[in-house]
Amino acid sequence: MFKKILLTAFTAALAFSLSAEDAAPSVYTSHYDWQFRSVETQDADPGENVRHQDDFTKPLHGPWLLNPATDSATIGWITRRPCAVGVEYREKGTEEFKRVLHVKYGAVDYSKDLHAIHLAGLKPGTEYEYRLISNLGRHQTPYSNEIFVGREIYSFRTIDPEKKNYKVFLTADIHGTARLTLDPMIKNTGSENADFYFFLGDNVCGDANLRNARYYILSGFMDDVCRIWGKNKHTVVLRGNHDFRGEEMYVFGDIFARPDGETFQAFRQGSTLFICLDTMWIPQTRYAEGGLQAEQIKNYLRKQAEWLKELKKSDDWKKSKFRVVLSHIGLFAGEGGYLQEYFLPVLNDPTPEGRIHVHIVGHEHLYNRINPGTKEMRIATAFASQKPKQHQERMKKFPIPDGIVYTQITGNYTEGMTIDVTPDKLIIKSHAWERVGGGLFDACEITPDGKVKDLVPVTVITPAPQKAKKK
């Protein structure tokens, strides 16, 4: 029932954003319904090729690629039961596979069905092939402890620090609708061949769905990610406030595992450094489900601010022409005021060597762009409301601070955004992917000096005027 309500609300939101005439056609021609069932396979030699019942090299969920980097990668997946696992990988075009096992305290770990293997020592900008292996211990099966090697061979490419031109895809606030929305979103934004993909938080639906974290994360979006690109291209998943609730919220970190145990990261490809932050949620007991959690939110935001200061000293920061910050919640014109004391002193740096160029966020379900030094929102005229009360009230309730020196872009509900990266400019587009015939909610160009150029006619929205006080 809850899922039906969610999808009904989603459809209603789309219809509300379009006129009745425009809403009649639809980009939706199908949806995906995930089922756990047996599948018949026609085979000339079934007796030889049927998989052994203890062969768990074909995952129940996954595999998925995480943590894009020049010299490492993370592969995650879920098996049908707890078992020992590993990854065999090789540089494409070579014969011999290297093997990495999942071990715990020096011994092979047979206790898990959710797995993450971190590969290290890779070459930049290089294509690798990989396959999964599995094994049961003698305490787990009376029949065999054979080591099974996967028949399926997947591939991925490490980050290339010298790559000049490429595209990345971003979405936000997908709220568990991927089985309906993700295919047309990718197609209608032209993102089939993006180098990597970002989810900017609120990936699951509802406030308490991380009570059943695996189900809502996997069926909500990751199964579809793996179906479309996730086995072969990196996905970066950030945590939103809806991903930060429920007694299984820690499973988010188990599924999207990092070798350093953090939920923030940065990596550079070509001219652009991508900086991914975890904005968590408002550090008050009524939001954070407990006094200790509220305290930890402050600790973790402070830790990220210190990490940003150190990142500014790194070669990747110094070599980048563009610095793109990504998070679920922005610092102003929305509910992110609690973030300002931690991040604004670090991010709002006017110097060429210290500046960021754009901060792209979600959460508000209301597209807008705020250019440096302005206190107004921009949106493509073709999609601007004649009565932009929501935008005006947002700026009135959550004022834009003085002296902001970078661009902030806030995505729509089920945002579909692309960044075309070149050596000399970033071209950022918010696509009206759910509209038959397409269109752009916004498009702009950002140059290394931080200047912004509109690429479509835009409407500028100023804050709602303050009401005069009665005498």
Where are the predicted features?
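Divalent metal-coordination and catalytic microenvironments
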Residues: 77, 128, 173, 197, ...
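Acidic, histidine-bearing metal-coordination/catalytic regions of metal-dependent phosphoesterases
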Residues: 21-170, 191-193, 319-320, 421-471
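Hydrophobic h-region of N-terminal signal peptides that target proteins for export
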Residues: 11-19
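Histidine-centered catalytic micro-motifs
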Residues: 174, 325-330, 357-369
